Amino acid sequence: MERYTEKAKEALILAAEAAEETGSRTVGTEHILVGLMKEGTGTAARVLEAGDVKLERVLELEKKLVSSSQPTQIRDREGYTPIARKVLENSYREAVRFHAPLIGTEHILMAMLKQTDCVAVRLLNTLNINIQRLYIDLLSAMGEEGAAGREELAQGRSG
């Protein structure tokens, strides 16, 4: 956790809590998405909010499609699903690519949006959220160009 910004750490703690509340034994990308949104002040939360991603709708859909009904306790904070772990590993690569000293919420969201087969992206798609627009808005919030973002997202999907 030492590689994360305070906001990213808070989002991951909230993700673990979301997993416990929904009865999941592991933290999935859907829980990380909820954690990013519940953190509320990071770049990822601002971009998601501006992109009309509503926490209530995500929680409702996640409960309907994904969760178990019984709360459980995650034994260790590293109890991520393989895809969630991959997203977190890729968030480190995104931070390095953008020359950031620490992994921020924006890097986690960026890695998540590129992982098109993850539960979080499937939830966003089900909510009719334009993933490409969200990615471009994220790049814009980070001070990058949108046209380059469309190309990067397309490359992320194929590789």
Please give the residue ranges for each predicted region.
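Histone-fold recognition with a strong bias for associated Lys/Arg-rich disordered tails
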Residues: M1-G159
